[in-house]
Amino acid sequence: RVLFRSDLFGAQLHELPFIWEELNAAGFESGHAYGKSLRTVKSCVGSTWCRYGVDDSVGLAIELENRYKGLRSPHKLKMAVSGCTRECAEAQGKDVGVIATEKGWNLYVCGNGGMKPRHAELLASDLDTETLIRYIDRFFMFYIQTADRLQRTSVWRDNMEGGLDYLKAVIVDDSLGLAEELENRMAHVIGTYQDEWRTAVENPEIRKRFQTYINASAEEQADPYIQFTEVRDQIRPLNEAERSVDRIPMVEA
């Protein structure tokens, strides 16, 4: 499987713009590991490196991630692309999962793992890439516009009157006549994408928010009450019992 996420632990608020500047300069863009938006798209190695792969799952995963990066939604969105039915990328456990077939791509929707796992459902079979992406555009935008706040696609689907048949009718058959509108709205979102790191470091008003102490100088921004210890050649914050902090004694009134 191919999945990349890099965590930088221990950074303080005032340090973030400087870290983002360095990452931007190296060619990185902001991700959304905690936001209500798209996570990195998971992929197996596909036909490029696997004898079982029937299509380029890595290439499609990159295309999908670049298309939907930064997309805001009622809850987090997870996607995966598997290059064959052996399903090494676990696409049938994602909000949107794609599996390669001999005739195209199978599109699965509304799955998730976690505390209440739900198997994704097959929305459409043997799609060419253009049709696949068009259906995903419609699905995501229909979900974003109709789901409740903090509602995953799985719960949204379970609460949907008419179930999968209704969802197929809306997304595939355009039963509500919304397809063009949904696609246009997604095109607008994609066309107005911005790298939030770059925006934050280049916009003085936004950058001013990243200060530990508003009235302190740059040299005085570090929070002295944040203390770390080293574990496995990495740092972690000290817990309450480990911290050496001068405390105000409590006395009876």
Model regions: which residues?
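Flexible, glycine/charged-enriched surface loops at secondary-structure junctions
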Residues: 1, 33-34, 74-77, 145-159, ...
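Small-residue-enriched alpha-helical segments and adjacent helix-cap loops
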Residues: 1-102, 204, 208, 215-221, ...
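Terminal amphipathic helices with adjacent charged low-complexity linkers/tails
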Residues: 10, 14-22, 26-27, 158-187, ...
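Glycine-rich loops and low-complexity Gly/Arg-rich segments
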Residues: 24, 32-34, 68-70, 103-107, ...
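Generic secondary-structure signature for well-ordered alpha-helical cores
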Residues: 24-28, 66-73, 137-149, 172, ...
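Alpha-helix boundary/capping detector
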Residues: 46-49, 90, 115, 165-169, ...
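Mobile "lid/hinge" segments at catalytic clefts and subdomain interfaces of large enzymes
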Residues: 78, 83, 87, 92-158, ...
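Charge-rich, low-complexity terminal tails
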Residues: 179-229
